[in-house]
Every structure is written in C-alpha cells, then in structure tokens.
Amino acid sequence: MTVVVTVERRMKPGSLREIHRLQAELWEIASRTPGYISGETVFSASDPDRFMTLSRWESIDHWWDWENNGERHDLFEKYSGILEVTRGPRVWRTTQ
C-alpha cells in the first residue's frame, strides 16, 4: 500500500538558499531509492521559516529504508545547524 510521509521543519532565518540546496540533494538521492514515487517541499504562507516535505513511497518498508539511508543521514548531519524538526515524520496510507 502506498504511503505519504510528511515532516514539518523550521529553518534558521536567512538560510533559504541552503534549504533549497539540501532539498535538491535529498530529492536526487531519494529518486535513486527503491520504492520512491515522488516528493515535494512546501513553504508556510504565514511563517517564512517553516516548511514541510511530503514524500510518496510504494510501501512503508520502502520509506523505512529511506529513513535509514546513510547518504540521507550524512546530508542531515551536514545541514543540522540550520534545521529543526517541528512535527513528524508522520506516515499516511493512501486508499489506492
């Protein structure tokens, strides 16, 4: 069953350029990960420092593989000074 995973984050003020770079790198790595379907980053309309990622996976097991991906962990370590998770990850099942 397909799942959608959401994670809300807050970035350090003034770090939007780095966030765009991080997201581009993450989506590139995810695209090579088995089970990845799609991903998107959306930014808060009321708070410029908040954003959310939504990723779609073929199964929760595929997402767990992504969650434990070494390249992914290395990237988050690299950008840890500008990020804070505020909610998530949350896993949602689809009806399809």
Where in this protein do the model-derived segments appear?
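Generic structural motif
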Residues: 12-14, 60, 94-96
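Short, well-ordered beta-strand segments in beta-rich or mixed alpha/beta enzyme
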Residues: 3-9, 40-68
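A broad, structure-centric signal for solvent-exposed, well-ordered loop/edge residues
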Residues: 18, 48-49, 73, 82, ...
